[in-house]
Design a protein with these regions (language model features):
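Catalytic alpha-helical scaffold of carbohydrate-active enzymes acting on polysaccharides/glycoconjugates
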Residues: 1-123, 130-189, 196-211, 233-252
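Active-site His/acidic residue clusters
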Residues: 224-231
Length: 255
């Protein structure tokens, strides 16, 4: 028996925040105002933590110059164990497109930036554009990565039954191994576009089927940066209701 054989479903929520190098300043400002700051502050106040978060290098640089108080909040949450920061290539490269040495170097740049700014030794990786190839495992391990988030479609395309993906996996290349977590496609498309009760029903169903781990990770920009989502998530009350439902699932022993 392992830790996933009994008890509530472990739901892991992951967020990816990115603005490309050279993007207009007003785009950074609008996303900070409409997405990054309101989501994190309301999630903190509403008890949605802990979360995992990836900040891209260009966004981290801009925030350091223009919104240090926001980074201070991230640092406080990380120090308290309420926010786990994820690695990636610093400038958001698609890792399989780079030579091996450049892959490792880009990740090490991000690792050092997170250590220097927040005092954390990040070991998980957000896979840019979720593009994977098996040879990445050895390079990620060499960069100090212990686990990576990967779309469940990669598993399905390799012949894994979808119902087997609600558990941690390990992969290996060059004699080096790496933990792999499958991002559930259904949850990724449901949150935040479906009513929270629909997501709750999905989570209850997963637990009833005997699953003990579900990973939902995607762009944070869909919580206020995509067209129509600001009103839906904040003004209409999706986020407040989602946090209420999430709390209820916890009280039921479901999640």
């Amino acid at each position: 028996m392992n830790e996933y054989d009994s008890g509530p479903l472990l739901l892991t929520l992951g967020l990816h925040a990115h603005q490309p190098e050279g993007n207009f300043g007003h785009v950074f400002e609008e996303h900070l105002r409409d997405v990054y700051e309101p989501f994190l502050r309301r999630a903190t106040d509403g008890g949605l933590l802990p979360l995992t978060l990836h900040l891209s290098g260009p966004l981290l640089d801009w925030l350091e110059t223009n919104a240090r108080d926001y980074l201070d909040l991230i640092g406080e949450l990380a120090a308290a164990g309420n926010l786990e920061l994820l690695l990636a290539g610093y400038y958001e490269p698609i890792l399989p497109s780079l030579p091996r040495e450049d892959r490792v170097e880009q990740i090490l740049w991000m690792k050092e930036a997170l250590r220097g700014r927040f005092g954390v030794d990040a070991t998980g990786l957000w896979l840019t554009e979720r593009v994977w190839e098996p040879a990445l495992a050895a390079d990620l391990a060499d960069a100090g990565v212990k686990y990576v988030l990967v779309d469940d479609r990669h598993f399905v395309a390799s012949g894994f039954p979808r119902e087997s993906l609600f558990a941690p996996f390990r992969t290996e290349a060059g004699g080096k191994s790496l933990g792999v977590f499958a991002i559930d496609e259904k949850l990724r498309y449901m949150i935040p576009f479906h009513p929270p009760e629909s997501t709750a029903a999905c989570l209850r169903g997963l637990r009833a089927e005997g699953h003990r781990l579900a990973v939902a990770a995607d762009d944070i920009e869909k919580f206020g940066g995509w067209p129509g989502t600001r009103d839906w998530v904040y003004e209409t009350g999706w986020l407040v209701e989602f946090m209420r439902v999430r709390k209820g699932l916890g009280e039921e022993g479901q999640v």
